[in-house]
Amino acid sequence: MVCFRKDMEIADFEYPHKINLTKHVEDYLIEDENEVSNLWIDRKDMYMKENPDNKYSCKPIRLGIVNKGGQGERIYSVKGTAITLSANGGGVFAKTGGYYINGKTRRLHPRECARIMGYPDSYIICQSQNQAYKQFGNS
């Protein structure tokens, strides 16, 4: 929805053309397993879909849940788009959501969040991981 004040007398507004999405979460992932080793999550109360679709999508693809499946407790495919990053929130995958990567689940690394939000790899991320998640969740 787009609104203008009547006194502005704007009559020729046109919506911008649709932009097709070409990237998915997997395009932003860090390749070095050692750099993300502390982000892997393995819990007994993790429930995955039995036959997940392996297709690409321009939407987030939910594959499973942890606990009751609240915010921060959902598991997504890297073949979809990223869910909204959050500056606040809890759950085992707080602030980034969980992603199923190479047969395991994990949160996103702050660098991956930065990439998703459009920051270049040259951008210096603060030392505090929690503060970095808040920054990118507020971007």
State where each predicted segment sits.
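Class I S-adenosyl-L-methionine
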Residues: 1-84, 88-89
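Generic structural signal for short, solvent-exposed loop/turn connectors between secondary structure elements
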Residues: 7-10, 98-104
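Short linear functional motifs in flexible/disordered or boundary regions
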Residues: 12-13, 97, 128
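Short amphipathic alpha-helical surface micro-motifs
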Residues: 64-68, 99, 105-107
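Short, surface-exposed terminal/edge motifs of secreted or surface/virion proteins that either
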Residues: 90-97
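FAD-binding beta-loop-beta segment adjacent to the flavin cofactor pocket
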Residues: 101-128, 132
